[in-house]
From Swiss-Prot:
Entry-linked InterPro entries: Ribosomal_uL14, Ribosomal_uL14_bac-type, Ribosomal_uL14_CS, Ribosomal_uL14_sf
A GO CC annotation given for this chain: cytosolic large ribosomal subunit
Name the UniProt record assigns to this protein: Large ribosomal subunit protein uL14
GO biological process, any: translation
Domain of life: Bacteria
Subunit structure, interactors included: Part of the 50S ribosomal subunit. Forms a cluster with proteins L3 and L19. In the 70S ribosome, L14 and L19 interact and together make contacts with the 16S rRNA in bridges B5 and B8.
Length: 122
């Protein structure tokens, strides 16, 4: 469950290390983002020489949340951290590698490129 001012780790190799959510996309009254939702973030921490700089405003998709997510079969999935992957304007990932596991819900939300780059889909 991601809302405004939530800090997230970055799960790709774009050079950003930490993000701050500044808007949840999907309507003016939308308060929370869950697995597979798109958010607007600002980069709070980045490595030198990376593709993104500190203070840059970027779009990202949520790939891991601490809040448990109920699946249609009745099982629950949750992770140890909140993490996101940075997106280009066309919805493709900006990085070329994804770190850590991602949720199966991204396949249903049509983020196939992220699913194919991920080392593990849970």
């Amino acid at each position: 469950m991601i809302q405004q001012e939530t800090r997230l780790k970055v799960a790709d190799n774009t050079g950003a290390k930490e993000l701050l959510c500044i808007r949840v996309l999907g309507g003016s009254k939308r308060r929370y983002a869950y697995l597979g939702d798109t958010i607007v973030c600002t980069v709070k921490d980045a490595i030198p020489g990376g593709n993104v700089k500190k203070g840059e405003v970027v779009k990202a998709v949520v790939v891991r949340t601490v809040k448990s997510h109920r699946r249609p079969d009745g099982s629950y999935i949750k992770f140890d951290e909140n993490a996101a992957v940075l997106l280009k304007g066309d919805g493709e990932p900006r990085g070329t590698r994804i770190f850590g596991p991602i949720a199966r819900e991204l396949r249903e939300k049509k983020f196939m490129r992220i699913v194919s780059l991920a080392p593990e889909v849970i």
